[in-house]
Amino acid sequence: MTGEILIFLAAGLIGGTVNAMAGGAKLFVFPLLLATGLPPIAANVTQGVALFPSQLPAIWVYRRELLADARTLAWQMLPALVGAFAGAVIMVNSSDEAFVKVVPVLLGISVVAIVLGPRTTEFMRWAFPGGRLKAATGVLLAALGFYGGFFGAGLGFMLLAVLSASAGATIGHVNGAKNLFAGAIQTVAVGPMLVSGLVDWVAAICVLVGGLFGGYIGAKLARRLPDKLARTGVAVLGVVLTMSFLFS
């Protein structure tokens, strides 16, 4: 049991460090939880419960920007929250066998989101000019809500791209909106996870504690490493993990 606790703490530490540097904590936490013998869906539920509080401090930091545009953000958030609840309900009622089959695809999506970054925003503005962008944003936010409730790795990058394309606001405002949406999506998704009975509470608490220390370490490292280098490192490791799922 001591060995498992160390792995849980390491998962949180690595996830928190990576999240603070470039994002994508679930790329690393999920495989480490699987390595301890947790079933795939239990591992996904456990990491969802353990990692969702990490979004809340960021929402508080951006509270002034968010309150200034609260009505618009609330309307935009509705489809995302509906999608999040649906994604979480479907996930906790899926079989481990079916979930494992889609994990490589989900990990691949998150890696692509990390690699593309701001270029996704440029593509959206090109693909949906004028009034079509607003409708496309609603559909995409619903889809991202579903993805966030179902799995959620790389969700922050995807939200940042969609919100940047539609907002036309300052980067601080968009970052605040991204954290708000990610926190709201994960909070809604946690409901079905908590009542599912699949949470491993020892693992969840260890990941949460490790994540707090990892977040501090990652923030320190992020000041010294260029954003592009950190993003590339996370993406490369993500590709390795995805390949290991494909060929395992």
Question: Residues of each region from the PLM?
Answer:
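Residues within membrane-spanning alpha-helices of integral membrane proteins
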Residues: 5, 48, 103-107, 111, ...
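Membrane-embedded alpha-helical segments in integral membrane proteins
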Residues: 26-38, 81-92, 147, 186-191, ...
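Hydrophobic alpha-helical transmembrane segments in multi-pass integral membrane proteins
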Residues: 86-87, 141-151, 189-197, 204, ...
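Selected transmembrane alpha-helices and immediately adjacent juxtamembrane segments
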Residues: 1-37, 125-175, 182, 205
